[in-house]
A protein has these predicted regions:
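Glycine-biased, small-residue-rich flexible motifs in mid-sequence functional cores and linkers
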Residues: 3-269
Length: 269
C-alpha cells in the first residue's frame, strides 16, 4: 500500500481533494510524470464501441501511456485487454479489495496487468464489492489520468459519474460520437451537447491536446553507466560545450574523453 503524500503516491490523484488516504496496490505504480488516460464506457458495449476502443488504444500506443479503467464488463475490460495485447501498461481500479477481484471472471486480466501496470483499490484486502463502492471508485479512475475518454454510454451510469468527476478535477474529458440511433452512444452525444465532454473524432486529437509532442516520454530514456558523468555535465550546463571545457569540468584527459564520446556516439548518443 501507499499513503497519501508518499513519494510514490500517484501524482494525478494527489491533486484531488477527495483522494483516498490509503491506496492498496499489486504490481507497479506508474512513476511521476507518466502519461495516463482513463478509458471508460457502458457495460453493454457494442461492436462499434469495441472497435473504437481498439483504434483509440492502438493510436495512443506510440506515446506509451498507462490505460486506466475499472475492470468491469464492456468497455472497461476491452480497454484492459487491448492494452495487454499490445504490451502496454494498464491499471485497474477496483470497487472491492485486492483479495476479492470483481468480477472474478476478469481475474486473468487482473493478474496479467501486474507485470507492467497495477491493480489498485482503497478497500481492505478481502472487502466485498458493494453497490456504493463503484461510484466512489470512479473518482480514482478520473483522478489518476490527465484525460478521460468515454467510448460508449447510455443516458445514465458510471461513465457519467467518471466524466463529471474528471471535469470537476479540471481534467480533459472526451466522448466518442457514435451512430445517431444507437442507445450506447446517446450518453456520449448528450455529454458533448452539454459541454461536459469534447468530441473525440480522431485519437490523435487527444495526443495533440495533451501536448504529447514526442512519442517517447523522458522516463523511457536510460543513460548507460559509462556515459553518466558526461551526460550529467552537459545537462547541468544546458548548452553545447567545447571538448576542452568538458575535459576541464570532468577532470578527464582529452584522449580518454575522445574515446568516451566516440563510444557514446556509437551507442546512439
Amino acid at each position: 500500500y501507499v499513503l497519501h503524500g508518499n513519494q510514490t503516491y500517484p501524482g494525478g490523484l494527489i491533486r484531488c481533494g477527495d483522494a483516498p488516504q490509503l491506496l492498496f496496490y499489486k504490481g507497479k505504480l506508474p512513476a511521476e510524470g507518466a502519461r495516463m488516460v482513463s478509458v471508460v464506457g457502458t457495460r453493454k458495449s457494442s461492436d462499434y464501441g469495441k472497435k473504437a476502443t481498439e483504434q483509440l488504444i492502438r493510436a495512443l500506443r506510440p506515446y506509451d501511456p498507462v490505460i486506466v479503467s475499472g475492470l468491469a464488463y464492456g468497455i472497461d475490460i476491452h480497454a484492459h485487454r487491448i492494452a495487454l495485447s499490445l504490451g502496454m501498461r494498464t491499471m485497474a481500479v477496483l470497487g472491492s479489495g485486492l483479495g476479492n477481484i470483481y468480477p472474478d471472471v476478469h481475474l486473468k486480466e487482473a493478474d496479467a496487468m501486474q507485470e507492467k501496470g497495477a491493480v489498485v483499490s482503497e478497500y481492505f484486502h478481502y472487502e466485498s464489492p458493494q453497490p456504493a463502492h463503484f461510484p466512489k471508485r470512479n473518482r480514482i479512475v478520473a483522478g489518476l489520468s490527465a484525460a478521460t475518454v468515454v467510448v460508449e454510454a447510455g443516458i445514465k451510469g458510471g461513465a457519467w459519474i467518471t466524466a463529471s468527476l474528471a471535469n470537476d478535477y479540471g481534467r480533459e474529458v472526451y466522448a466518442v460520437p457514435g451512430p445517431w440511433s444507437a442507445p450506447t452512444s446517446r450518453g456520449c452525444h448528450q455529454m458533448i451537447a452539454s459541454n461536459l465532454a469534447s468530441v473525440l473524432d480522431h485519437p490523435e486529437h487527444l495526443a495533440r491536446d495533451l501536448n504529447w509532442l514526442e512519442k517517447k516520454p523522458l522516463s523511457a530514456v536510460v543513460i548507460p553507466e559509462f556515459a553518466q558523468p558526461v551526460a550529467q555535465a552537459l545537462f547541468r550546463h544546458m548548452a553545447p560545450m567545447h571538448i576542452n571545457d568538458l575535459s576541464r569540468v570532468l577532470c578527464m584527459p582529452i584522449a580518454r574523453l575522445h574515446g568516451l564520446l566516440l563510444e557514446m556516439e556509437l551507442n546512439g548518443w
